[in-house]
């Protein structure tokens, strides 16, 4: 489902935009039947105003699309998305709805808490050892899906604090995981220890 501008339309219209991609459960994950949804949200990097969104998923996609369509029409910003008080009951939604989560991620990007790089830019990263591509997924995920690139260093997030000595502070670190949450947490840990992430 889609509402507002997509990337192609924004580029064609000369609209400045950035995007975040979030992965959330359709309702409280501890309640049976929750399914993942992928939410791509376009926003104005200067003001945080929401410009467009696309969602792929199953249950609850229509509900989130309606909220985002209204947010775009009302000119809401990332900060206002985080404050939306949306319906919550474990079978139907989470305390922090996928729409709220998109707002939080946009806030973090705009505040400079994390520098995001999307999956399609990984091939452009130098493979000469001048940067570190760090994979923080679990060993099981890496066994099942493989590393993003053969030169990636695998340190699961749960082990990162104890293995910081394996990383070179003189090299920029690019972090990947399955959904972005662990990459964000890893970058916060690394930044707090003097790494450029």
Where would I find each of the regions flagged by the language model?
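Positively charged, proline/Ser/Thr-rich regional signature most characteristic
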Residues: 124-177, 185
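Flexible, glycine-rich terminal cap/loop adjacent to redox cofactors
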Residues: 2-6, 11-112, 148
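A short, well-structured juxtamembrane/interface segment
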Residues: 113-127
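Hydrophobic anchor at the start of a short beta-strand
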Residues: 17-18, 152, 173, 197
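Short loop/edge segments at beta-strand edges and connector loops
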Residues: 21-23, 117-118, 156
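Hydrophobic/aromatic residues in well-formed alpha-helices
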Residues: 10, 81, 121-122, 160
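Cysteine-centered nucleophilic/redox motifs
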Residues: 10, 179-195
């Amino acid at each position: 489902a889609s509402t507002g501008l997509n990337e192609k339309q924004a580029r064609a219209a000369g609209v400045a935009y950035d995007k975040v991609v979030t992965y959330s459960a359709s309702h409280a994950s501890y309640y049976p039947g929750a399914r993942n949804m992928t939410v791509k949200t376009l926003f104005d990097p200067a003001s945080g105003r929401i410009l467009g969104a696309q969602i792929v998923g199953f249950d609850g996609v229509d509900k989130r699309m309606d909220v985002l369509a209204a947010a775009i029409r009302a000119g809401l910003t990332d900060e206002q998305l985080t404050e939306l008080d949306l319906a919550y009951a474990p079978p139907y939604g989470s305390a922090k709805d996928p729409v709220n989560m998109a707002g939080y991620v946009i806030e973090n990007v705009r505040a400079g808490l994390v520098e995001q790089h999307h999956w399609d830019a990984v091939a452009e990263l130098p493979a000469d050892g001048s940067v570190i591509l760090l994979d923080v997924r679990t060993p099981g995920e890496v066994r099942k899906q493989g590393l993003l690139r053969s030169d990636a260093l695998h340190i699961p997030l749960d082990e990162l604090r104890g293995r910081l000595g394996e990383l070179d502070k003189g090299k920029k670190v690019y972090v990947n995981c399955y959904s972005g949450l662990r990459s964000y947490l890893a970058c916060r840990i690394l930044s707090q220890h003097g790494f450029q992430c």
